[in-house]
Design a protein with these regions (language model features):
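Electropositive, gly/pro-rich neighborhoods at or near active sites that engage anionic ligands
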Residues: 40-191, 197
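Anaerobic metallocofactor- and corrinoid-dependent redox/one-carbon enzyme cores
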Residues: 2-37, 44-45, 171-526
Length: 526
């Protein structure tokens, strides 16, 4: 059968094997998928030549971040912008004395399945790494070790290497991603303040408003500054929800609350919304015609026919005046609108980052020692359309009253409006933050392990993870790099992980797919 495209990087890939038709399940057309492969091949050629000729520079560093982030799922559907980025990669290749011979990605897709699996883990993992490094650099925080590794990892993709040479690089992706998440945590807290537990309303007040989605807190900061005093309210959506916990953002009284749920519901939630929506990162779904004129993209996000907010290359400043004008034109709702979470709740709470949790570490430790807390669950990761994802809500609802649930990333929308009660003064459900705040979860786990003089694997802690795109891959590799075992992963296992590579992960880390709530809870708690 003739393939129009090949892409299997996300959890929703067709048939659990790969998208090969005229378009991917994500909405990416075959031509766009090919252009993204061409861009990736150009990056591999540039990085390999620069590495071997020792001609790395900050211009190439930035191109690598932009190029890798552009090819992340649900980021860029715009052929023209992808082609322009590839042209910039070609220009830089020529500038350092290389030749334009893009690496043929079919050599990876058609390779031995175990080699393909390891190279896919490297490629998809560094796409996640690049996203986190991109956000940190916008705030002026840079890791030379990360920049150097991305050359090495891209170069490795064009080598005819075996398992023994590729597997260490797979694990190194996890190591570098930990550095990136730590750096981004530092960047966010030093720029926007230390997150604190914050209650967030799901009510949208009457009058003009703007919705901002994605992960870029700096974009939100600029939008809040430019809308201050204009009678326009701002609401977060999706992965922007944890922004409410940062003091430098929460101080703006017109940052009112959160609207909507996880990314996969946006086409329904935005269809009749009388307000513009700003996409700062993934996850963008192809917008319906009914609301496309109200959509704005920025950064590496792009979609044909949608207005794009450019930024100054040096200052990263953006002009949101077109968004503001659209908000005033649309006018918002005539009366307050009470929206709810997926379970009918009218409010959610976020901000339980490592600083907040560890500030009451003695209370947590005493509760464990006294038997008030029997177990911790990290139920975290991405959401999506797979019906099996209802498992995560059902799991959280079934956790006993003497257990604590930590969560992060957009998978939390399945259950973040539930009231699980408290253990003493501690809420049983704690939202740590965005997907990159997996670093906070790691910090909390390590601190608890030190307090109890044991390893993380010996803690009464279980990780029940959901994945969708490539940032989840990089986080999983970080957990494996740290030697964390007994992870349960769902809703399905990645199509790009071969049987042999999966067996390797099972043997070394006892990673396993989710089964049923009852079986998994019994296996964990007995």
């Amino acid at each position: 059968m003739t393939q129009n495209m090949f892409c299997f990087q996300c959890e929703q890939t067709a048939g659990g094997k790969g998208c090969t038709g005229c378009a991917g399940v994500c909405g990416k057309k075959a031509d766009t998928a090919q252009l993204q492969d061409n861009l990736t091949g150009a990056l591999i050629t540039l990085a390999s030549y620069a590495l071997h000729q020792q001609k790395q520079n900050t211009v190439i560093d930035k191109l690598i971040l932009d190029g890798l982030f552009t090819t992340l799922t649900n980021v860029n559907f715009h052929d023209e912008t992808i082609q322009k980025l590839r042209q910039r990669v070609h220009a830089e290749t020529l500038a350092i004395g290389g030749s334009i011979q893009d690496y043929d990605m079919q050599r990876i897709w058609n390779a031995d399945e175990d080699i393909r699996s390891l190279k896919s883990l490297i490629l998809f993992g560094i796409r996640g790494v690049a996203a986190y490094a991109y956000h940190a650099e916008l705030l002026g925080y840079r890791s030379e070790k990360t920049a150097a590794f991305l050359y090495k990892a891209l170069s490795a993709l064009q080598e005819d290497w075996g398992l023994e040479q590729l597997l260490p690089i797979v694990m190194e992706v996890g190591e570098i991603n930990l550095i990136c998440m730590e750096l981004l945590d530092q960047a966010n807290t030093e720029t926007f303040g230390t997150p604190a537990p914050t209650e967030v309303s799901l009510t949208v007040e009457k009058g003009p408003f703007i919705v901002i989605t994605g992960h870029d807190l700096y974009d939100l900061k600029q939008l809040l500054e430019q809308t201050d005093g204009k009678g326009i309210h701002v609401y977060t959506h999706g992965e922007m929800l944890p922004a409410h916990a940062y003091p430098e953002l929460n101080q703006y009284t017109h940052l009112k609350g959160n609207i909507g749920t996880a990314w996969q519901n946006q086409q329904k939630e935005f269809a009749q919304l009388p307000a513009p929506v700003v996409y700062t990162t993934n996850c963008l779904m192809p917008p319906a015609g009914s609301y496309q004129d109200r959509i704005f993209t920025t950064g590496v996000v792009s979609f044909p026919g949608v207005q794009h907010i450019a930024s100054d290359d040096d200052t990263h400043q953006k002009d949101f005046s077109a968004v503001i004008a659209k908000a005033l034109e649309l006018g918002g709702y005539a009366e307050d609108q009470q929206f709810t979470g997926m379970n009918g709740g009218s409010k959610v709470t976020t901000g339980f980052a490592h600083q907040a949790v560890l500030s009451v570490a003695d209370v947590v430790i005493d509760a464990v020692k006294a038997g008030a807390i029997r177990h911790f669950f990290l139920v975290a990761g991405c959401d999506g359309v797979n019906s099996k994802r209802s498992y995560y809500r059902d799991f959280v609802q079934a956790t006993p009253a003497d257990t604590v649930v930590l969560t992060l990333a957009c998978g939390k929308y399945r259950f973040n409006d539930l009231d699980l009660g408290t253990i003493g003064n501690l809420p049983r459900l704690m939202d740590i933050g965005q997907c990159n705040d997996a670093y906070s979860a790691i910090k909390i786990a390590v601190a608890l392990a030190e307090a109890f003089d044991c390893s993380v694997n010996e803690l009464p802690l279980s990780m029940i993870l959901s994945w969708y795109e490539q940032k989840a891959v990089s986080i999983l590799l970080t957990l494996l790099h740290l030697g964390i075992k007994n992870i349960k992963l769902g809703p399905t296992l990645p199509a790009f992980v071969s049987a042999n590579v999966l067996n390797l992960l099972v043997e070394n880390y006892n990673i396993a797919p989710i089964t049923t709530v009852e079986q998994d809870l019994k296996a964990i708690l007995g």
